[in-house]
């Protein structure tokens, strides 16, 4: 079941994906599609790929969108940047301005852990545009920004809920915990039809 749910989640993501850029890997940042513009930013390829803006700096990627639809910008951060800020704008409108807090993102992390933030970009903001400029900079003018790691994605908005919904032809189904369900039926019931559906 777990593999099936993971495959379903991956399929939803792939169907929704509009664009991807690999920060820190110049060949993909500077291609015709993404046309990176930057001032005082640093790309790295030593431990995965990443890019961050030095104090007062920035970097911008042109990214494809789904016009007239809600989109989502997916950015990966690391625990090593705990307490650093990052401000992200789409065509000049700030969509994310946060100080990274891994204690909020995960209960237990190490400095090599990564997590992905899904940032809504509304259909009103996108309008009929097929491309937007996505700008990354520090939220604090006198400090370096947090780094964006590995890949930055622009997707159509999609559901990430892969929970199971179970129904029974007889009795009731209750979720016991994250991995099990209980089916309660009358003592005279000899068989039930069980239907499983992904949310």
Sequence positions of predicted segments:
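Extracytoplasmic
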Residues: 1-158
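Beta-rich interaction/scaffold domains
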Residues: 158-199
């Amino acid at each position: 079941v777990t593999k099936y749910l993971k495959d379903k989640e991956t399929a939803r993501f792939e169907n929704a994906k509009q664009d991807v850029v690999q920060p820190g890997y110049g060949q993909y940042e500077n291609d015709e599609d993404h046309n990176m513009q930057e001032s005082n930013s640093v790309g790295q390829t030593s431990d995965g790929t990443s890019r961050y803006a030095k104090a007062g700096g920035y970097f911008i990627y042109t990214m494809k969108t789904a016009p007239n639809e809600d989109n989502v910008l997916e950015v990966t951060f690391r625990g090593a940047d705990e307490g650093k800020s990052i401000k992200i704008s789409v065509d000049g409108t700030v969509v994310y301005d946060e100080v990274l807090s891994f204690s909020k993102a995960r209960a237990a992390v190490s400095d090599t852990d990564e997590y992905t933030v899904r940032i809504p970009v509304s259909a009103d903001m996108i309008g009929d545009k097929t491309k937007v400029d996505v700008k990354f900079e520090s939220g604090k003018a006198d400090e370096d920004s947090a780094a964006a790691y590995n890949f930055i994605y622009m997707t159509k908005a999609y559901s990430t809920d892969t929970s199971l919904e179970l129904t029974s032809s007889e009795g009731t189904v209750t979720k016991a915990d994250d991995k099990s369900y209980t089916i309660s039926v009358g003592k005279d019931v000899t068989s039930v039809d069980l239907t499983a559906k992904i949310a």
